[in-house]
């Protein structure tokens, strides 16, 4: 059975670093207008998922709202909430313990749970939220 994976909202930004090996990783805005870089801390506020593989200075296509592949660092079950970890990879979000991380969406198709695989995640980076104690 097929699934519509068309994005609802994407942004064209500028890669402020070489992102050529980070397709399907989480990205954040930098302090420079219209620039993005890979998430490198769980407290980073992700803007979306990198959908292409640009070198530094090239156009980065970023998925903000929609259903996107997300590379994961560990198994993420279907219907689990997802965060972007300190390596820019998706991981399970536990709202009561991940109090400094942002939930970016819900896994709608699990990959099988091997690190570096792509799970399919319904992403809403316009409205990510932090966990609560």
Predicted regions and their residues:
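Surface-exposed, low-hydrophobicity beta-strand/loop segments enriched in small/polar/acidic residues
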Residues: 1-133
